[in-house]
């Protein structure tokens, strides 16, 4: 079930969509393992969703390994991708190799994801592929560069910006990524990139013409009522469900109804 060539086959382009979910913990991963989801991403977005930070920048490689190990234990049958966090690969090719090797060896993930499409990143992708590390690319709004962008804004809107992103996507493809995430770019640009590159594109706010989609599990389940970006569809309202369950528990504890005979030894 974890065959990279089956899940992210270029032959799927334009035919069968790929479903990816971002997850950070054992309990949810165990549920995902029972579904038809194609792949799980352990994203450095855990810095915001799980830790409560305002960006992904504080996340460390050790924290990524910790969470990826937990997800792997819960989802042994899924193709598992782990983010390399900020400054774990940007300082040098050697550091990138060490970080990728460390997270793959210690967490048992199947691939790593890195952000950007510069000449340096493409060189790193090429070398990692040569030594046996599958790499997923990430273009558009790359959260590790949020301060450069001036916030979480749609990328690739102007002609110069869109041309640059398209060029980077082709360079990433030629460098050997097996897939690439396209985040918060115009739908038409997402379509164009998907047509130009020979590997599956996974969109998040990049339109319906990408070869697949990714959402954070907590977001699609509706756990955060305050988070509602345009690209997000909430498939449930767990915030209300969880809140009601806790209220019922609180009420029964205080009334003495719980624990009853059925819950006592």
UniProtKB/Swiss-Prot annotation:
Residues where Mg(2+) binds: 44, 83, 115
Pathway in which this enzyme or protein is active: Cofactor biosynthesis; (R)-pantothenate biosynthesis; (R)-pantoate from 3-methyl-2-oxobutanoate: step 1/2
SUPFAM superfamilies: Phosphoenolpyruvate/pyruvate domain
Binding site for 3-methyl-2-oxobutanoate: 44-45, 83, 113
CC per GO annotation: cytoplasm
Localization of this protein: Cytoplasm
Regions annotated as coiled coil: none
UniProt cofactor(s): Mg(2+)
Subunit structure: Homodecamer; pentamer of dimers.
HAMAP family: PanB
Purpose: Catalyzes the reversible reaction in which hydroxymethyl group from 5,10-methylenetetrahydrofolate is transferred onto alpha-ketoisovalerate to form ketopantoate.
Record family assignment: Belongs to the PanB family.
Protein name listed in UniProt: 3-methyl-2-oxobutanoate hydroxymethyltransferase
Gene: panB
